[in-house]
Swiss-Prot record:
Domain of life: Eukaryota
Organism, as annotated: Homo sapiens
Region of interest called Disordered, as start-end residue ranges on this chain: 198-243
Disulfide bonds: none
Keyword Phosphoprotein: yes
Residues recorded with modification N-acetylthreonine: 2
CDD domains, sorted: RWD_RWDD1
Protein name, per record: RWD domain-containing protein 1
One GO biological process term: androgen receptor signaling pathway
Domain RWD residues, every copy: 10-114
Entry GO CC: cytosol
Biological classification of the source: Eukaryota, Metazoa, Chordata, Craniata, Vertebrata
Biased composition (Acidic residues): 209-243
Positions bearing Phosphothreonine: 144
Length: 243
């Protein structure tokens, strides 16, 4: 007859020796304990971690222990679900023998896989962003390829803008036509300007002042009187140039 209590006590001692820093006893009856499992360091020393809680059933190891995710860090919901499925599979495969070390080892490997997946996912995201940036740069350099659809869209927009320009121009020309003077109006306007100049002079009358200083320097000019020349003949134009 199997002594389940003895097997459970022996395994507990072994687990405490293997996991001295992460093994914690929660209760002795029924035997319940936790083991914290941490992945290897990934990119930027990032890790994922979970604390597994186990409780021995009365006939363990012929019956599977009770287990649950007691706590976790950096795990997605789907990761937690995958770990629980893994524990169920491993417990089923190891019935009849003590299995906690085997279950913990399987979870340890799973956490390492998750870290690798996180690294791969980030690398793919980085490559995707670089690809999108490169495509955007190419698009900016080469422009948008002309298709029937985008040409028709451009044509409709162009026609609408052209129509607005024509309407604006017609409105300006119409407004200019209203303000444009006829030939008769231009003539009357010029005549009125002449009349206003004459009227200005008449109104000035004797009030117009002449600046005599403009003529003061005339006295300083040495003018030669041609009539004092004895050879000067008024009837002979060439006599003046005989000299």
């Amino acid at each position: 007859m199997t002594d389940y209590g003895e097997e459970q006590r022996n395994e507990l001692e072994a687990l405490e020796s293997i996991y001295p820093d992460s093994f914690t006893v929660l209760s002795e009856n029924p035997p319940s304990f936790t083991i914290t499992v941490t992945s290897e360091a990934g990119e930027n020393d990032e890790t994922v971690q979970t604390t597994l809680k186990f409780t021995y059933s009365e006939k363990y190891p012929d019956e599977a222990p009770l287990y649950e995710i007691f706590s976790q860090e950096n795990l997605e919901d789907n990761d937690v679900s995958d770990i629980l499925k893994l524990l169920a599979l491993q417990a089923e495969e190891n019935l009849g023998m003590v299995m906690i070390f085997t279950l913990v080892t399987a979870v340890q490997e799973k956490l390492n896989e998750i870290v690798d997946q996180i690294k791969t996912r980030r690398e793919e995201e980085k490559k995707q962003k670089e690809k999108e940036a490169e495509e955007a740069e190419k698009q900016l350099f080469h422009g948008t390829p002309v298709t029937i659809e985008n040409f028709l869209n451009w044509k409709a927009k162009f026609d609408a803008e052209l129509l607005e320009i024509k309407k604006k121009r017609m409105k300006e020309e119409e407004q200019a036509g209203k303000n444009k003077l006829s030939g008769k109006q231009l003539f009357e306007t010029d005549h009125n300007l002449d009349t206003s100049d004459i009227q200005f002079l008449e109104d000035a009358g004797n009030n117009v002042e002449v600046d005599e200083s403009l003529f003061q320097e005339m006295d300083d000019l040495e003018l030669e009187d041609d009539e004092d020349d004895p050879d000067y003949n008024p009837a002979d134009p060439e006599s003046d140039s005989a000299d």
